[in-house]
């Protein structure tokens, strides 16, 4: 797996106040020095109480969850009690030499806003956090407490992104970033491009490497040609799970993306802890 350390440096996307410091780290890395490794996409939860459509997702034990009636291995089996804690994450990050991370969210885990605020209070120099957009208004005062906003665009009841422009406007106005997992392929790319052009200063990270295993995924990558739009690879090992490590097709897809938007627009994301059911956190780099 290509370790996109240079791309990860672009966590300027989320580390607003540390931009110059991170930029200097990037220049050092270009000259052969030691760089900072940032995980741009992972998850935390204290208690999992999510949903997929109308179906509930509930943690069981040994890393398993009841996924709308289907039992799935949601986490490594050593996560015994269904909790995916910040303490275990930091331990994994320390071992894998990961300096910082962006904690995103997902409907299948339930809204973790309150827990993430606790996590950042414990480790303010290691993590940035997103509040979860759930197709209803989020007060400015609440958004202000977070670094970004997560939109699970592929799971929205109304998948026309133009009908959600208010949250994009708020993010730009409040100087927050958007972390977004888009619907498969090019289903939402035209609307997304309109929003990018409407809010040109808004910083956006497109997750799951543009849903790289679906037709039209390159259209999502092309969005990163815009100045403040980036692509992150959270979930790419899951999307290519049938071929296993070192994921040669995933490597080819990364090279294709480099040709489309340039390596400086790509960020590494692990999708911890779900992808750790097949590989270790360190291997995901």
Provide a role label for each language-model segment:
Residues 213-285:
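H/E-rich (His + Asp/Glu) clusters that bind or coordinate divalent metals
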Residues 42-43, 106, 209, 235, ...:
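Active-site metal-binding loops of divalent metal-dependent hydrolases
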Residues 30-105, 111:
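An N-terminally biased module of ancient metal coordination in phosphate/nucleic-acid-related enzymes
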Residues 16-35:
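Short, Lys/Arg-enriched N-terminal segments with co-localized hydrophobic residues
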Residues 84-89, 114-115, 136-138, 189-192, ...:
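Alpha-helical scaffolding within the catalytic cores
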């Amino acid at each position: 797996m290509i370790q996109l350390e240079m791309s990860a440096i672009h966590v300027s996307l989320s580390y607003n106040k540390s931009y110059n410091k991170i930029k200097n780290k990037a220049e050092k890395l270009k000259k052969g020095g030691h760089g900072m490794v940032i995980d741009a996409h992972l998850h935390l939860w204290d208690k999992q109480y999510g949903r997929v459509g109308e179906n509930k997702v509930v943690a069981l034990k040994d890393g398993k969850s009841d996924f709308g009636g289907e039992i799935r291995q949601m986490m490594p089996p050593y996560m015994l009690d269904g909790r995916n804690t910040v303490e275990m994450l930091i331990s994994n990050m320390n071992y894998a030499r990961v300096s910082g991370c962006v904690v995103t969210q997902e409907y299948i885990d339930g809204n973790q806003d309150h827990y993430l605020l606790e996590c950042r209070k414990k480790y303010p120099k290691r993590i940035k956090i997103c509040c979860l957009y759930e197709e209803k208004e989020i007060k400015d005062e609440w958004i202000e407490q977070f670094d970004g906003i997560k939109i699970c665009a592929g799971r929205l009841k109304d998948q026309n992104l133009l009908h959600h422009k208010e949250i994009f406007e708020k993010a730009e106005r409040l100087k927050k970033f958007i972390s977004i997992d888009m619907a498969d392929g090019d289903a939402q790319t035209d609307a997304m491009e309109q929003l990018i052009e409407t809010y040109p200063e808004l910083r956006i990270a497109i997750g799951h490497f543009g849903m790289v295993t679906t037709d039209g995924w390159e259209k999502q990558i092309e969005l990163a040609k815009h100045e403040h739009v980036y692509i992150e690879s959270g979930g790419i090992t899951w999307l290519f799970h049938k071929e296993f490590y070192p994921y040669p097709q995933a490597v080819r897809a990364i090279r294709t993306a480099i040709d489309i938007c340039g390596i400086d627009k790509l960020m590494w994301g692990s999708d911890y802890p779900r992808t750790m059911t097949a590989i270790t956190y360190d291997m995901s780099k």
